[in-house]
Amino acid sequence: VITYAACGGALLNDYAPFAFGFAYIAMAYSVGNISDCHLNPAVSLACLIRKKMSLIEFLYYVGAQLFGGLFGSFLLGLCLRGYWGVLYSSIVTNKLRHPYKKDKNGWNRQDGWYYVDGLLVEFLLTFIFVFAFLGAKDPKQEGKHQGIVIGLSLILVTNMECYFANASVNPAKALGSALIEWFELDDPNNNRAIKQIYIFMAAPLAGGACAGLVYGLLAGD
């Protein structure tokens, strides 16, 4: 749903953060009572660290998330067949895209620091999102508004992330779309998503893990 509906909505209009946030809210109230609606390996890793799920459950969840990201990317591309190049140069795939190439001194921002920027942004925004998820799902919280809180948090981080790297904070979404781009685009020089996939896998997982550890320390459990 995140890859198919949210990315599809973001592709066809200028409101990408809302597409992702509303997609999560819809799923939270649809399947949240069944699976807690992680939809993101970084979230599942944080829950594993907090001992909210077993290792076997974690592997099942992550496997389903990765499959969902790949299948959703495939369906979206199938619905827009003939436009793979346009589709996967857009919000669907995660690539670093610094808003400027050089500063006033002529320093090229696409050197090594360009990738450090991406790693840092992915780490910090995933940390914020997963921390908000854990807080909203804490049993101490009362009410049934967790899905709205988490969806709004996703809108917040996506709003900033679109500026840097096409809005990921989700390894499953990033990997699925990158693999489809890799298989479908003829020009290997355009396959930047798969070449940069380590950023969108490692940084969100690290951010999710740190969020789980920090939340556990602050919550005293």
Would you name each region that the model predicts?
Residues 1-221:
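Membrane-interface helix-loop junctions and terminal tails of multi-pass membrane proteins
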